[in-house]
């Protein structure tokens, strides 16, 4: 086979990376997102002409999808065929440097655009009837932050805190989410330091339209708090189906324990949907440890990741068609 023939054959090979990026190409609402960012982007009235906004957005999405640094993202855009095709670039001269990508990300953070992009996805899902608002699953996950003081500032991230989970201590942040119980998609996201207790965030994760709330034992007593939402906007009572602690399952007769286990299993089977979205963010996107310091940047990062996770999960279930 000639070199040109081999090159043509390789161009037709569909790698997993290429297939994944073709999915992203199809599901991202490019027009909406670009229109939202454009007013905050460089106008190009002075100095050098800014890089194309869509190119910068595509690079930024790649950075989030693959958990890459600024420098690694632009390097991949030049070296990886799948990345360069996704970005629509043919030579290294068309790709900005890492500092330029970092400045673009800071524009998004400064203007709260990641939160707006997440809200835009929620709006899109509502338009398609994918958020039924009948019930919410509340849950959280810890995102670790570097605990070492061996850095330029000689200190740990001042906005991050430590919390004990089981027998282990964790330092970092916590992503609290409210998930639609029917579709398994995230409708609400709040980011705090890791030491904020789950139950204190319950009311902030509800839409006010649900009739039932599911959560693990970390949310026990949520309905008794002063800020608890007891009735929804229609005046209907909200039921809190919170899993009991294992120690509470050992009381009573064998028959009552069996009945209790069945009820708890039913609650857990509903709650299991929340693990799918965490699986995308921490598994597929590999975001288990922070890259940036400060609650503001962490909130922005997680809003972007959960926006993308919602689109991917909705597409997997053929809900975006």
Locate the predicted segments by residue:
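Short helix-capping/linker segments at secondary-structure and domain boundaries
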Residues: 65-72, 185, 284-290, 310-321
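A positively charged, amphipathic N-terminal helix/segment that binds anionic biomolecules
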Residues: 21-35, 40-48, 55-71
């Amino acid at each position: 086979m000639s070199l040109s023939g081999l090159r043509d054959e390789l161009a037709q090979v569909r790698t997993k990376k290429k297939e994944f990026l073709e999915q992203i190409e199809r599901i991202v609402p490019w027009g909406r997102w670009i229109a939202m960012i454009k007013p905050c982007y460089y106008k190009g009235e002075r100095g050098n002409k800014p890089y194309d906004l869509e190119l910068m957005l595509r690079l930024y999405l790649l950075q989030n999808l693959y958990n890459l640094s600024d420098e690694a993202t632009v390097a991949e855009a030049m070296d990886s065929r799948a990345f360069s095709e996704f970005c629509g670039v043919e030579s290294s001269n068309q790709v900005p440097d890492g500092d330029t990508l970092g400045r673009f990300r800071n524009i998004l953070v400064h203007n709260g655009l990641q939160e707006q992009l997440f809200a835009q996805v929620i709006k899109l899902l509502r338009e398609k009837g994918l958020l039924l608002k009948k019930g919410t699953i509340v849950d959280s996950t810890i995102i670790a932050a570097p605990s070492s003081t061996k850095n330029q500032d000689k200190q740990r991230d001042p906005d991050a805190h430590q919390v004990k989970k089981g027998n282990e201590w964790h330092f970092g942040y916590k992503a609290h989410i409210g998930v639609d119980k029917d579709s398994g998609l995230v409708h609400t996201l709040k980011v705090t330091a890791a030491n904020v207790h789950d139950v204190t965030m319950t009311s902030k994760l509800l839409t006010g339209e649900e009739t039932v709330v599911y959560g693990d034992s970390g949310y026990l007593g949520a309905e008794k708090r002063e800020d608890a939402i007891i009735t929804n906007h229609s005046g209907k009572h909200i039921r809190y189906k919170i899993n009991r602690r294992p120690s509470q399952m050992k009381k009573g007769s064998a028959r009552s324990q069996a009945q209790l286990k069945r009820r708890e299993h039913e609650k857990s089977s509903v709650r299991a949907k929340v693990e799918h979205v965490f699986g995308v963010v921490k598994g597929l996107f590999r975001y288990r440890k922070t890259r940036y310091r400060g609650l503001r940047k962490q909130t922005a990062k997680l809003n972007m990741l959960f926006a993308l996770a919602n689109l991917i999960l909705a597409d997997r279930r053929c809900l975006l068609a």
